[in-house]
A protein has these predicted regions:
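Coil-to-beta-strand transition motifs
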Residues: 51, 60-66, 123-125, 132-138, ...
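Phosphate-binding site of ATP-dependent enzymes
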Residues: 11-96
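A short, polar/proline- and glycine-enriched secondary-structure boundary/capping micro-motif
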Residues: 6, 77-83, 149-153
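A long amphipathic alpha-helix within ATP-dependent nucleotide-binding catalytic cores
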Residues: 29-39, 81-137
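C-terminal active-site "lid" helix and adjoining low-complexity regulatory extension at the edge
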Residues: 114, 132-170
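Single conserved hydrophobic/aromatic residue that forms the stacking wall/gate
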Residues: 1-9, 39
Length: 170
């Protein structure tokens, strides 16, 4: 069923502005070229610890999860920590520093990895995002252009290594 709430004029204006925005023009990401903008309202989610949600983002190549990162402290002091599929911390950064201390392997790590594999099946490359809130997994999004393809890994040799995982059809 549909629930209608009245919004303050400022918020309504912001929503209307978003509906006129063409996201294709931002970074020329072709899947967005002919998408008609829509507003989707989701339930607000927070973890019981009150420290903000952690994003679990799996990089899949040819349908297989190869690495993931955990985004913490969003949006004020964002931290990214990258891990292989055995949950070993990887020695590079991208766009944000590492967390101040070690991060624990999520209890639902294996289930999230399997869900990422299923969602990535048949795709050459995709990032599959999840939240794990109080033991419940929530799907975030599928991303075909991580950082719009414009944020190198540091040190840069990781760009080449990760790029080698992507097999393009000829």
């Amino acid at each position: 069923h549909t629930v209608v709430h009245s919004f303050p004029t400022r918020r309504s204006s912001d929503l209307n502005k978003s509906l006129r925005h063409n996201f294709f023009l931002d970074h020329r990401e072709y899947p967005y070229k002919n998408v008609k903008p829509r507003i989707i309202a989701e339930q607000y989610m927070e973890d019981e610890d009150g420290k903000g949600l952690k994003d679990y983002k799996f990089f899949c190549f040819n349908g297989e999860p190869r690495m993931m990162f955990i985004a913490t402290n969003r949006p004020v002091d964002t931290r990214f920590d990258f891990f292989d599929m055995d949950f070993n911390h990887l020695p590079f950064a991208q766009g944000h520093p590492w967390a101040d201390g070690p991060l624990s392997k999520p209890v639902n790590f294996e289930q999230m990895r399997e869900l990422a594999r299923k969602l990535a099946k048949g795709l050459q490359q995709v990032r599959v995002d999840f939240y794990d809130i109080n033991g419940q997994i929530y799907f975030g999004e599928l991303t075909f252009f991580h950082f719009s393809g414009n944020c190198p890994f540091q040190p840069v040799e990781w760009d080449e290594r990760i790029g080698s995982w992507w097999t393009l059809e000829k």
